[in-house]
Curated annotation (Swiss-Prot):
Annotated InterPro entries: BetI_C (IPR039538), DNA-bd_HTH_TetR-type_CS (IPR023772), Homeodomain-like_sf (IPR009057), HTH-type_TetR-like_transc_reg (IPR050109), HTH_TetR (IPR001647), Tet_transcr_reg_TetR-rel_C_sf (IPR036271), Tscrpt_rep_BetI (IPR017757)
Transmembrane segments: none
Domain of life, per lineage: Bacteria
Ranges of the DNA-binding region feature: 31-50
Main function: Repressor involved in the biosynthesis of the osmoprotectant glycine betaine. It represses transcription of the choline transporter BetT and the genes of BetAB involved in the synthesis of glycine betaine.
Protein's recorded name: HTH-type transcriptional regulator BetI
Any one GO biological process: negative regulation of DNA-templated transcription
Keyword Transcription regulation: yes
GO molecular function terms listed in the Swiss-Prot or TrEMBL record: DNA-binding transcription factor activity; transcription cis-regulatory region binding
Annotated ranges, domain HTH tetR-type: 8-68
Length: 198
C-alpha cells in the first residue's frame, strides 16, 4: 500500500513522467508501465492512483491546463491596463514552463489525438475558449467587440502555429521572438489599418 500522504507527490511525479514520455515519443501510444518506469514507481501504483492509461492522460492534460490557468491568473493580477493584460497573456503562453520542448510535443500529440477522443477534444476546446475570452476582454477595451474577436482569433492561431513551428525544430523562433511576433500582430491590428473586410 502507498504511504499515507504520498499520493499527491506520486500523482504529480506520474503526471510529469507522462509529459516527458509522451513528449519523447510524440504519441499517446505509450503504456502505463513506460510512464511508471519514467516516474520510478511500479505500474501497479500508477494504476492504483489513476485507474488506467486514459485517466492518466486526461489527468495530465488537466494538470497542464491548471498550470497554465494558475500562471495566467497570477500574471493578469499584475496588469493594470488592457495592453499589459494582453502582454501578460502572450508571455505566459510562451513562458519557460509552457514553451518547453517536451510540453510542446505533448500538447501537439493531444491535438492529433483529439480527432479520436471526445474527452481530449473537450479539454482543448476549453483551452481555446479561455485564451480567446481572456484576449477579447482586454481587446474590447481598445477596439470594437467584433474586431476584438477577430484579433483574438488571429492571435490564438498564431500562438498555435508558433508551437507547431517550434516542435518541428527547423528555424523555430525562441520564446522572446514568438512573443514579439504575436505582440506585433496585435499592435498592427489595433493600429487602425483596414481589415480584409474593408
Amino acid at each position: 500500500m502507498p504511504k499515507i500522504g504520498m499520493e499527491p507527490l506520486r500523482r504529480r511525479e506520474l503526471i510529469d513522467a507522462a509529459i516527458r514520455t509522451i513528449g519523447q515519443r510524440g504519441s499517446l501510444d505509450v503504456t502505463v508501465a513506460q510512464i511508471a518506469h519514467e516516474a520510478g514507481v511500479s505500474p501497479a501504483l500508477a494504476h492504483h492512483y489513476f485507474g488506467g492509461k486514459d485517466k492518466l492522460i486526461l489527468a495530465t492534460m488537466r494538470h497542464l491546463l491548471r498550470e497554465l490557468g494558475r500562471d495566467l491568473n497570477a500574471a493578469i493580477k499584475q496588469a493594470n491596463t488592457p495592453h499589459e493584460r494582453i502582454a501578460a497573456i502572450i508571455a505566459v503562453n510562451f513562458s519557460a514552463t509552457q514553451f518547453a520542448q517536451e510540453t510542446i510535443a505533448a500538447w501537439l500529440t493531444f491535438y492529433v489525438h483529439a480527432q479520436q477522443s471526445d474527452d481530449i477534444k473537450r479539454l482543448l476546446r476549453i483551452y481555446a475558449r479561455r485564451l480567446h475570452s481572456n484576449l477579447v476582454f482586454a481587446l474590447e477595451q481598445l477596439t470594437s467587440r467584433a474586431r476584438a474577436n477577430r484579433i483574438a482569433e488571429g492571435a490564438g492561431a498564431m500562438i498555435d502555429g508558433l508551437y507547431i513551428r517550434h516542435a518541428l525544430g527547423a528555424d523555430a523562433p525562441d520564446a522572446a521572438s514568438a512573443i514579439a511576433l504575436v505582440e506585433d500582430y496585435i499592435a498592427i491590428q489595433l493600429s487602425g489599418q483596414p481589415s480584409a473586410e474593408n
